[in-house]
Amino acid sequence: MAAHRSAHQPRDPDWELRGRASFARQPLMQTLGVTLEALAPGEVTMAMPFAPHILQQHGFVHAGALTALVDNACGFAAMSLMPKGTGVLTVEFKMNLMSPGKGDRFLGVGKVIRPGKTIMVTLGECFAETKGERKLVALMTATMMVVDSPGIVD
């Protein structure tokens, strides 16, 4: 997984190692089969495979699974720009579901729009991928908080 250039500068020189370690400690992402596809300062891409246990009653991937994927991508994009010794928590998000969740796998892309010292505004996109073709199925705006509190360190 190659990182690409980013306009953002991380505040922690070990941001990538810290991000990968934090991701590995997330049981929900393991349950959903989510993997890190790309990690750059201020931008993260995660992938989730189609699986029967994440479907809703009509055979589409449940909106909750898509939301978890994109929220996590946004959170890790924000975390990549946070100082060492801090953690990230979502304080608000809005998800627009534009198309049913149909595809072989789903990509969640989180991007930091405004990297504040205590609050970061992010944009998330969810793509359904089938045979290499991508379709935008959902958009998220999310606000992430930089948490400097014992027990909440990523």
Predicted feature residues:
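Non-catalytic linker/capping segments at the edges of enzyme domains
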Residues: M1-A47
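Hydrophobic residues in beta-strands and at strand termini
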Residues: M48-F50, L97, V146
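Hot-dog-fold acyl-thioester-processing enzymes
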Residues: A24, P49-A73
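HotDog/MaoC-like acyl-thioester-processing domains
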Residues: A2-A3, H8-P13, P100-D154
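Residue-level recognition of specific faces of alpha-helices
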Residues: L66, G87-L89, K94-L97, T118, ...
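Hydrophobic beta-strand-centered segment that forms part of the acyl-chain substrate-binding groove
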Residues: V61, F76-L107, V112
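A generic structural signal for short beta-strands and their flanking turns/coil linkers
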Residues: Q30-L32, G42-V44, G87-F93, D104-F106, ...
